[in-house]
Amino acid sequence: MQIVRNIDDLRQEVAKLRISGAPVALVPTMGALHRGHVALVDAARSRGCEVVVSIFVNPTQFGPSEDLDAYPRREAADAAMLDGAGATLLWAPDVATMYPPGFATSISVGGVSERWDGAARPGHFAGVATVVTKLFQQVKPDIAFFGEKDFQQLAVIRRFVADLDIDIEIVGVPTQRDDDGLALSSRNAYLSPEERVTARTLPRALGEAAAAIGRGGDVAAALAAAIARLAEAGFDPIDYVALVDAASLEPIDRLDGPARLIAAARLGGTRLIDNLAVEPAP
């Protein structure tokens, strides 16, 4: 696996990859990789793709009081993991390459970005949309793979790709979880051993709510029960627990089509997010 750090080298190497005729896939990441990221590479390889992975800790998607400086950076270990997973190319630009002096453009996606994490983290999705658009322009992939754990992010990306007529297939890959159900996340490393035990309450509370709603139970009651369980376990604040339309992310109060149960809450100093598909019980 090659590692490239400037745009000219990236474009030359991607052009070489295209000679084989195989599709080129992009897996955007911020590093601190885990099995969830490997699953994205695996999904791309299963489609017969040459796999380009980007690692860039994007400052424009962090708020002023968030964890930009603390976010884990371990490129050597990440590169070894990607090499073992079969990635073809690692694109690892620095901040000056991505945001050179005079950079003045931001992409704002209305609607789907405005609630939930968009409300809790002002400016976050503009940063995401801008950097992902740049990565798309730099790599020009045929397909891009994103984890469903960041479900609102995936919805935002699908929205601007459709709105801007970007000819890239967007593939969502199911959330990868630890044995106790906690969604894999680079930020799980922030949890103390005690918090890590408590954190499993989040997927369990969501699972119970999803099952209740799927059985035809009252949506408001199921959401209230999940919030109460999280509060009792020590999550504070609880930003949201909501049942939403899977495409628009607008809140819904009954199952009429594809739906998602989404949640975000803080445990100690760590903000955790998760989501589950909700379907009517057979």
From Swiss-Prot:
Binding positions (beta-alanine): Q61
The active site of this protein is located at H37
Q: In which pathway does it act?
A: Cofactor biosynthesis; (R)-pantothenate biosynthesis; (R)-pantothenate from (R)-pantoate and beta-alanine: step 1/1
* Gene Ontology CC terms: cytosol
GO MF, one term, reads: pantoate-beta-alanine ligase activity
Instruction: List the InterPro entries.
Output: Pantoate_ligase, Pantoate_ligase_C, Rossmann-like_a/b/a_fold
What's the name of its gene? panC
Which top-rank group of organisms is this from? Bacteria
The EC number on file is 6.3.2.1
Q: Which protein family is named in the record?
A: Belongs to the pantothenate synthetase family.
- Job of this protein: Catalyzes the condensation of pantoate with beta-alanine in an ATP-dependent reaction via a pantoyl-adenylate intermediate.
The organism encoding this protein is: Rhizorhabdus wittichii (strain DSM 6014 / CCUG 31198 / JCM 15750 / NBRC 105917 / EY 4224 / RW1) (Sphingomonas wittichii)
Q: Where does (R)-pantoate bind?
A: Q61, Q153
Oxidoreductase listed as a keyword: no
Q: Keywords, A to Z?
A: ATP-binding, Cytoplasm, Ligase, Nucleotide-binding, Pantothenate biosynthesis
Q: What class of enzyme is it?
A: ligase
User: Please, what other remarks does the record include?
Assistant: The reaction proceeds by a bi uni uni bi ping pong mechanism.
Q: How does it assemble?
A: Homodimer.
Intracellular or extracellular location(s): Cytoplasm
Chief location category: cytoplasm
Q: What is this protein called?
A: Pantothenate synthetase
Q: Which GO terms describe its biological process?
A: pantothenate biosynthetic process
What residues bind ATP, as annotated?
A: 30-37, 147-150, 184-187
The reactions it catalyses are:
(R)-pantoate + beta-alanine + ATP = (R)-pantothenate + AMP + diphosphate + H(+)
